[in-house]
Design a protein with these regions (language model features):
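Short beta-strand-alpha-helix junction that forms the catalytic/metal-binding core
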Residues: 99-106, 130-142
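Polybasic, low-complexity binding patches
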Residues: 121-122, 128-137, 149-182
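N-terminal pre-ligand scaffold of iron-sulfur
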Residues: 23-127, 171-231
Length: 231
């Protein structure tokens, strides 16, 4: 989001905190530590240099929770009214960057919690249609064929997912052309994720719940994951 829009969302969240009726109806943004997106060499990632229609991965707000970073190659929709599985509404405020084409979402599927690992990924952004995918330019989870529209807040287009992917809030600085992750919006699946994969994550190092601080390393999915399942 642009900086002034980020301030507006924070103000709206604060206002909702003082109005119980609004809290019951709307899902407020969840703010986490600020983490600047950086390339593999540690240099700040430049939004204008982010390749279009490629899957990029970073981890936020925890060390083990993966997210998609996507340049859609076209402006995302300016806003979308969405709701969580428990019927809390929220408004997604569109893409960021020079063309407002950059979006970010949790890469944990809202149905069965499939996510990209270093070995395999059943979920990714697909520009093409297929026999099982009637939509182009969607995030498609091949585990149960949930499909999400990244240009409209990850709205569910098909499949059993009960809600959109949680959006990752990005603060874009046009002066430096840099991106900073600041929080989430929508239905988080982090608690369910940690409960389901507790043993696996423990075997991978035991720091899965460590909050991400200062920076997030961004890597292309094909360089992060050995096998991408296509469907």
């Amino acid at each position: 989001m642009q900086r002034r829009e980020f301030i507006k969302i924070c103000a709206a969240s604060a206002a909702a905190a003082g109005a119980p009726d609004l809290v019951a109806q709307d899902a407020a943004p969840a703010m986490y530590g600020r983490a600047r997106l950086v390339a593999g060499n540690g240099a700040p990632l430049k939004a204008s240099a982010l390749a279009a229609n490629r899957n990029f991965i970073f981890h936020y707000p925890y060390a083990a929770t993966p997210c998609f970073l996507l340049n859609l190659g076209r402006p995302a929709k300016p806003s979308a009214r969405l709701s969580t599985a428990d019927k809390r509404g929220y408004e997604w405020k569109g893409g960021v960057g020079p063309q407002r084409s950059i979006v970010a979402y949790s890469a944990i599927c809202a149905h069965q919690l499939a996510y990209p690992t270093k070995d395999i990924s059943f979920i990714s952004y697909r520009t093409e249609k297929s026999a099982r995918n009637k939509h182009s330019n969607v995030i498609h989870c091949c585990a149960e064929h949930s499909q999400y529209d990244p240009a409209e807040g990850a709205r569910v287009l098909a499949g059993p997912a009960p809600q959109p992917l949680a959006a990752i809030l990005l603060d874009y600085d046009p002066r430096s052309d840099e991106l900073t992750a600041v929080g989430t919006l929508g239905g988080e699946m982090f608690n369910q994720f940690f409960a389901k994969y507790e043993m696996k994550l423990a075997l991978e190092g035991g720091k899965s719940r460590a909050p991400v601080e200062a920076t997030c390393a961004v890597v292309e999915l094909e360089n992060y994951c050995r096998q991408q399942v296509k469907c």
